[in-house]
């Protein structure tokens, strides 16, 4: 609605109930392309054809437990896919801004009781987390080697930054091993909700929170190309960093029905128990801050799932965006 010409590059949707499918986004943008980012030459060809100016790179294999099953594919997508996007940027003169989205799990997790800052070590126990840490290292290398702010205007015209969000929730997500989709699937089927890691603490936030940060950052990078080419955290308020059990309990209250089962198992695949982000940098240097508390984030998310069967998904999204803007 703001007038941007959007070109989308992705694999097929996860399900026919995805927000992307139900809201008909593919028919509302300039181009909707089915491409695997592991195909570097195809990515370069797309960039040559469409001559984009701003890149938001979100494509990934995003699931921790699945990464144990397909570690090579996870690395190929999350590391080499990211490099392919940066190489396509490097080969296309039209690109001026690149915002590379990774994850809060890119940090070497020490289960510390304070939030990670942007200058802390990259790492990761599982293939997913470590692949994102590796992607961050690659982004930093490409920024220093090919998109160095010192050389802007002489050797290149690209501002490149990376962003790390917390655990994102929102309507229309049906992915595996995610707490909100798992809750909704069980509730719709009239079943109890099984919680495998009830005490795990995460920085929960509604999807519109980090997206607003990404867009603000891209705008500032466009206006001042050498000032913001760094890593940035976009996380929730401190009180929104809560255990999985509390999230599921709130979902049940808002949805109006349901029962939780504690399915804790010490023998399951390793997942971090405690993860928090420090967002001071984005607050003070960008003027960004989260608008909603955790209850409001869950309320807006559950609202989508309660409405999507009887209302137009695109209209629901516009309504929720307007609610978010007015928070």
Kindly give the residue locations of the regions a language model identified.
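C-terminal substrate-binding subdomain of Rossmann-fold SDR/epimerase-dehydratase oxidoreductases
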Residues: 3-9, 35, 167, 187-327
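A short C-terminal helix-loop "cap" of Rossmann-like NAD(P)-dependent dehydrogenase/epimerase domains
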Residues: 25-28, 119-121, 145-160, 183-195, ...
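Residues in well-ordered alpha-helical elements
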Residues: 40-41, 53, 65, 72, ...
């Amino acid at each position: 609605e703001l007038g941007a010409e959007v070109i989308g590059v992705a694999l097929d949707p996860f399900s026919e109930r995805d927000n992307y499918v139900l809201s008909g986004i593919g028919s509302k943008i300039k181009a909707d392309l089915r491409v695997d980012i592991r195909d570097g030459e195809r990515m370069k060809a797309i960039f040559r054809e469409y001559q984009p100016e701003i890149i938001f790179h979100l494509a990934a294999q995003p699931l921790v437990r699945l990464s144990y099953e397909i570690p090579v594919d996870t690395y190929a997508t999350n590391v080499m896919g990211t490099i392919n996007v940066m190489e396509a940027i490097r080969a296309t003169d039209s690109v001026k801004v690149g915002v590379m989205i990774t994850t809060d799990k890119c940090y070497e997790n020490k289960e510390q009781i304070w939030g990670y800052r942007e200058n802390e070590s990259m790492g990761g126990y599982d293939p997913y987390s470590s692949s994102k840490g590796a992607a961050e290292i690659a982004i930093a290398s490409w920024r220093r080697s090919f998109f160095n702010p010192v050389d802007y205007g002489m050797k290149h015209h690209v501002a490149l930054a990376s962003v790390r969000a917390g655990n994102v929730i929102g309507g229309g997500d049906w992915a595996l091993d995610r707490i909100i989709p798992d809750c909704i699937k069980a509730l719709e089927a009239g079943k109890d909700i099984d919680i495998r890691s009830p005490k795990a603490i995460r920085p929960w936030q509604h999807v519109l929170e980090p997206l607003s940060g990404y867009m603000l950052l891209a705008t500032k990078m466009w206006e001042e190309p050498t000032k913001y080419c760094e890593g940035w955290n976009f996380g929730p308020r401190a009180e929104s960093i809560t255990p999985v059990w509390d999230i599921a309990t709130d979902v049940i209250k808002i949805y109006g029905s349901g029962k939780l089962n504690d399915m804790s198992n010490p023998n399951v695949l390793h997942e971090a128990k405690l993860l928090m982000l420090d967002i001071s940098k984005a607050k003070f240097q960008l003027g960004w801050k989260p608008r909603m508390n955790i209850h409001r984030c869950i309320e807006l998310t559950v609202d989508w799932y309660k409405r999507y069967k009887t209302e137009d998904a695109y209209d629901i999204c516009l309504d929720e965006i307007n609610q978010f803007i007015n928070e």
